[in-house]
């Protein structure tokens, strides 16, 4: 069944709009994060990434990393634009394993080297935006999202 994301359904929309994702494609942590993101006034937009279809990061292993969310916080200067995109992968505590360590390592390298390259040089659609990659665990997601929202 497809439906809008609310407190009783587990369906995702794009930043309060109407792109839908099937109920079984989201876990409880992702659902909680999505609901929380949707209530943040300082967010310009957020997007629930669709695994194996949308945005991905290619590390040194064969399989691509499809992060859970892309998030843009309003720029403090004008409140209309954004200067940074946050790439967020959420993980349950029971999923702290070798795969999670790999994703953290890939994201760490992305954070280290991304600032040295302008998106325009890569012909990417975000132009001159910064990008920050994060793996967030279920016991810290609220504080980490608050940090994202308040530190832009």
Spans of model-derived segments:
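Electrostatic, structured charged patches in enzyme active sites and in nucleic-acid/phosphate-binding
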Residues: 1-152
């Amino acid at each position: 069944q497809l439906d809008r994301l609310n407190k009783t359904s587990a369906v995702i929309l794009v930043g309060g709009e109407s792109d839908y994702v099937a109920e079984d494609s989201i876990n409880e942590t992702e659902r909680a994060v999505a609901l929380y993101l949707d209530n943040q006034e300082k967010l310009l937009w957020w997007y629930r990434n669709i695994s194996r279809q949308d945005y991905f990061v290619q590390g040194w292993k064969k399989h691509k990393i499809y992060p859970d969310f892309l998030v843009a916080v309003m720029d403090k200067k004008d409140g209309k634009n954004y200067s940074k995109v946050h790439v967020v992968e959420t993980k349950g505590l029971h999923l702290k394993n070798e795969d999670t360590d790999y994703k953290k390592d890939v994201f760490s390298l992305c954070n280290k080297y991304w600032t040295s390259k302008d998106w325009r040089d890569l012909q990417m659609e975000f132009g001159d935006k910064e990008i920050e990659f994060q793996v967030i665990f279920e016991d810290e997601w609220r504080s980490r999202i608050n940090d994202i929202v308040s530190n832009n």
